[in-house]
């Protein structure tokens, strides 16, 4: 697997190397949190159909650039994973060869139907004689069936097509897809301090519970986890944030222990592995968000006891 490190001008670097050297790949995997990976994917996709991108940059003057432009203040078309209340994918701007896929409104997954629709669209070839590009944003929300369907496309990619996957973590994508993709890593844009003036209120509330884990009863932790019941799409987003905060809190806890000359306990290391497994259960196995939150909090309580 080829790899690139994130730098501030990463879109230009990627395109200079890929387009300038005529080595555009069939699959890319952008990983990192925050908006930058998805924004970069959109810029990259637009540049791949730009008529004047020999320097690896979108010219913004050719017809392709005009058609692929999206007003930042505009409202994107709402998708539906089942294709009943809306389309399964949309175009970037109104360019027919730039496709964008993400979870549908209220959906908990990127569905296998959405991936199959993208397969069909990519195999049809470009409408305007250049490349056809598909971006899958939030690719970590594909379940194993959708990922396996995508793998079949990558095993025999149509000519002059590129697929750009955007995921918060590479580990959420199966190894056989990762091995066929050029990896682009981004720094964590959304990371915030757990205890500073810019910490969001919902994060501060979680940290307060974690800081007092040793004093929390099982009942209190179960009561806290009850907030993650309800509509699964919303609850899953909340538990994803809970997992992120817990992972950072645990990392700092272990770091503090090492700084005091203590050896991290086996239970702390096991808790870190459990965090990753719970993340996979939530995303790939459709686990109940409230139950994931309960297992997470009770497991951390045991780890620091």
Please annotate each region the language model reported.
Residues 145, 153, 176:
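Residues that scaffold the ATP/ADP-binding catalytic core of kinase and kinase-like folds
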Residues 1-55, 64-67, 156-305:
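Charged, glycine-rich active-site and insertion segments that engage polyanionic ligands
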Residues 120, 152, 179:
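Conserved adenine-binding aromatic site and its adjacent loop/helix in ATP-hydrolyzing domains
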Residues 123, 148-162:
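Conserved catalytic/switch belt of AAA+ P-loop NTPases
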Residues 1-145:
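Clamp-loader machinery-focused feature within the broader ASCE/P-loop NTPase space
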């Amino acid at each position: 697997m080829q790899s690139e490190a994130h730098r501030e001008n990463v879109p230009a670097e990627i395109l200079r190397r890929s387009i300038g050297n005529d080595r555009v790949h069939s699959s890319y995997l952008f990983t990192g949190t925050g908006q930058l990976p998805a924004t970069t994917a959109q810029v990259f996709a637009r540049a791949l159909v730009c008529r004047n991108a020999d320097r690896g940059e979108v010219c913004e003057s050719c017809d392709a650039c005009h058609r692929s432009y999206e007003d930042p203040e505009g409202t994107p078309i709402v998708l539906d994973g089942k294709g009943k209340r809306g389309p399964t994918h949309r175009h970037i701007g109104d360019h027919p060869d730039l496709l964008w896929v993400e979870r549908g409104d209220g959906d908990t997954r990127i569905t296998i139907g959405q991936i199959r629709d993208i397969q069909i669209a990519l195999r049809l070839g470009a409408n305007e004689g250049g490349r056809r590009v598909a971006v899958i944003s939030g690719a970590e929300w594909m379940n194993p069936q959708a990922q396996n369907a995508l793998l079949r496309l990558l095993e025999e990619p149509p000519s002059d097509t590129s697929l750009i996957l955007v995921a918060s973590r590479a580990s959420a994508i199966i190894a056989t897809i990762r091995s066929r993709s050029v990896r682009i890593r981004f720094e964590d844009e959304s990371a915030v301090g757990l205890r500073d003036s810019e910490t969001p209120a919902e994060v501060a509330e979680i940290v307060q519970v974690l800081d007092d884990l040793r004093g929390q009863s099982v009942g209190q932790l179960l009561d806290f986890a009850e907030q993650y019941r309800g509509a699964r799409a919303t609850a899953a987003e909340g538990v994803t944030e809970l997992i992120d905060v817990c992972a950072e809190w645990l990392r700092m806890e272990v770091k503090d222990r090492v700084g005091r000359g203590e050896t991290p306990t086996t239970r702390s290391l096991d808790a870190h592995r459990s965090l990753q497994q719970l993340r996979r259960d939530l995303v790939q196995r459709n686990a109940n968000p409230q139950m994931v939150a309960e297992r997470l909090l009770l497991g951390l309580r045991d780890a620091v006891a």
